[in-house]
Amino acid sequence: MAHKKGGGSSRNGRDSESKRLGVKAYGDQFVSAGSIIVRQRGTKVHPGLNVGRGGDDTLFAKVDGRVRFGRSRGRSVVSVVREAPA
């Protein structure tokens, strides 16, 4: 005879790893060329001046400068404004 009842198995208890999405460089922050500005799924934020978009919709700086967030045609847009070396 069984000493204990059979321990049932649970079908829950799993979760996916977080993807660490979001803004990585905020407005007025200085970034160097190639720096990631926003990690996202889809184009929640669109690339503006001096900003490129990667295959996974990541936005990155094409030049050294300061990050500027704004709106254009009803969309959120991020640009990088070149800054003269101090």
Curated annotation (Swiss-Prot):
- Identify the Pfam families for this entry: Ribosomal_L27 (PF01016)
A Gene Ontology molecular function term of the record = structural constituent of ribosome
**What UniProt keywords apply to this chain's record, in alphabetical order?**
Ribonucleoprotein, Ribosomal protein
Superkingdom of origin organism: Bacteria
Give the matching InterPro entries: Ribosomal_bL27 (IPR001684), Ribosomal_bL27_CS (IPR018261)
Q: Name one GO cellular component term.
A: cytosolic large ribosomal subunit
Gene3D superfamilies attached here?
Answer: 2.40.50.100
SUPFAM superfamilies in the record: Ribosomal L27 protein-like
Which GO BP terms apply? translation
Q: Which residues does the annotated region (Disordered) include?
A: 1-21
Regarding protein family, the annotation reads:
Belongs to the bacterial ribosomal protein bL27 family.
Question: What is the recorded name of this protein?
Answer: Large ribosomal subunit protein bL27
Originating species:
Rubrobacter xylanophilus (strain DSM 9941 / JCM 11954 / NBRC 16129 / PRD-1)
Gene of this entry:
rpmA
